[in-house]
């Protein structure tokens, strides 16, 4: 695929074994962790946890990243679209209050394909760094958008995120 999913619009080739884009990730999802997560904002975690899927890679590369192993070092396991759909169902079956996609920007295509296979009955959370394509948000795929507010100026963002 020629990738233009994030605002960088890098036109990179992203295939199963090719990852030329800014995010450095292949087209197939790479997941660092998927499980119930009790440490999000209380309204997201609830009493049973948020069904969190941590994707590897990132479109920001902030110098202060708390998840740099996940965001820049490709830590995680490559999974199929079918497996992503299964993970959503498994998390829902475990009692998750929602399905929480963390750093999903560069894998929105995979999430949409997985949702065609299985659509959870619980809310879908788009948990991101805040550098997003407005057209994606207008598509109304996700129920909750959890954005990080990192910077108030372009100058600061250029200094601390690549």
Region annotations inferred by a language model:
Residues 1-20, 25:
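Auxiliary Fe-S-binding modules of radical SAM enzymes
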Residues 19, 23-145, 153-155:
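Conserved Radical SAM active-site core
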Residues 156-162:
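Anionic-ligand binding region
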């Amino acid at each position: 695929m020629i990738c233009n999913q994030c605002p960088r619009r890098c036109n990179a080739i992203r295939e199963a074994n090719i990852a030329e884009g800014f995010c450095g990730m292949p087209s197939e999802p790479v997941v660092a962790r998927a499980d119930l997560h009790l440490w999000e904002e209380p309204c997201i975690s609830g009493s049973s946890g948020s069904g969190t899927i941590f994707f590897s890679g990132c479109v920001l590369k902030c110098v202060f990243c708390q998840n740099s192993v996940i965001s820049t070092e490709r830590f995680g396991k490559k999974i199929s679209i079918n497996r992503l759909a299964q993970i959503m169902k498994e998390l829902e079956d475990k009692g998750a209050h929602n399905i929480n996609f963390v750093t999903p920007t560069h894998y929105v295509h995979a999430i949409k394909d997985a949702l065609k296979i299985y659509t959870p009955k619980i809310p879908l959370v788009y948990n991101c760094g805040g550098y997003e394509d407005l057209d994606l948000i207008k598509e109304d795929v996700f129920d909750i958008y959890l954005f990080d507010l990192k910077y108030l100026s372009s100058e600061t963002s250029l200094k601390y995120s690549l």
